[in-house]
Each structure stands twice: as structure tokens, then as C-alpha cells.
A protein has these predicted regions:
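HotDog/MaoC-like acyl-thioester-processing domains
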Residues: 1-6, 113-153
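Non-catalytic linker/capping segments at the edges of enzyme domains
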Residues: 1-57
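A structural signal for the main folded, soluble domain(s) of proteins
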Residues: 33-35, 102, 153
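Residues at beta-strand starts and edge strands
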Residues: 36-38, 90, 104-108, 124-128, ...
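Preference for bulky hydrophobic residues occupying beta-strand positions
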Residues: 40-42, 94, 110, 132, ...
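Non-catalytic surface loops within mature trypsin-like serine protease
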Residues: 44-46, 98, 114, 149
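Short, well-ordered alpha-helical segments
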Residues: 55-75
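Hydrophobic beta-strand-centered segment that forms part of the acyl-chain substrate-binding groove
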Residues: 72-116, 142
Length: 153
């Protein structure tokens, strides 16, 4: 087996994955909910320009914002005024079908069918296989979350 030197490793590595993601600033411009559904728009306020000169919404950033959707929906769905503890992402299956190059109002959707919610005995609610879409299906997938709701109800 060949051992790569630090210089060889750096020559192959992505600037974005090494440091660029740290420069990103994003925020929700809107969040709307109804039973079983959440929609949010994300604005990209700052990013490192990739080598090809065109912004690409990354898989890493999508995971962060999809996680935020799960947290917000789980808290809202259980009538919590604030997050009661750490929400845990248990499963994640995402497909990246096409690139997202827009930086304004990137649309995220979460669908939480009634059958996906299960109350656990120890003050947790489990959402299994919630469905997610980003930018009309550019990214799609499912995720499962454990949401603490405080003392068992």
C-alpha cells in the first residue's frame, strides 16, 4: 500500500471540504407549517466561490438545513414553546439528483405523514421516515428524528 505525504493529500483535497464550508452564512427567510408539512426558504448570504465560478448548494449544507426543519417541525408539532433538549437525527437517506445554484429562497420541504410519528414512553417522540425535498426535487430523501418533549406525557 502507498502512503501519501501531506502535500499529496492536500493536492487531491477539496478546498470547500477543507475550509470553504466554514465561510458559509445562511439563514431562513421564511418558515411555514401545517399539520404534516413544513416549508422553509433559505438564503445564502456568504459563500466561498468554487473553482468553476458558480455557487453549488452542498450536500453538507442541505443536511444542516434539513435537520433544522426536523427540529422546528418536531417542536411545533408537539406544542413546545422552545426546543426541550437535543433533537437526534437517527437515519438519513438523501439523493442529489441535480445541482442547486441559486442563493436566494432555496425551497426546503418536509412531509411528516401521521403514521411516521410515534410517542415513546421516555418523553421522546420519534418521527420515522419523514420525506424531504429541496428545490422541487433537486435533492430528495427521508430522515428519522428523536424529539425530546420533556417529561413523559
Amino acid at each position: 500500500m502507498i502512503q501519501l505525504s501531506a502535500a499529496q493529500q492536500r493536492a487531491y483535497m477539496s478546498d470547500y471540504l477543507t475550509n470553504g464550508w466554514r465561510e458559509e452564512r445562511m439563514s431562513f427567510s421564511s418558515v411555514s407549517l401545517e399539520p404534516g408539512y413544513i416549508e422553509a426558504k433559505v438564503n445564502v448570504e456568504h459563500f466561498q466561490m468554487p473553482g468553476d465560478g458558480r455557487f453549488h448548494f452542498s450536500a453538507q449544507s442541505a443536511i444542516i438545513w434539513l435537520s433544522q426543519l426536523g427540529i422546528i417541525y418536531g417542536c411545533w408539532d408537539n406544542q413546545l414553546a422552545a426546543k426541550a433538549g437535543e433533537v437526534y437525527l437517527r437515519d438519513l437517506d438523501l439523493k442529489f439528483k441535480r445541482t442547486i445554484n441559486t442563493t436566494q429562497e432555496v425551497r426546503f420541504e418536509g412531509i411528516f405523514p401521521k403514521y411516521c410519528k410515534k410517542q415513546l414512553a421516555d418523553g421522546l417522540v420519534y418521527y420515522k421516515n419523514a420525506h424531504f425535498r429541496v428545490e422541487s426535487g433537486a435533492f430528495t430523501g427521508t430522515a428519522s428524528f428523536l424529539v425530546p418533549i420533556g417529561a413523559a406525557q
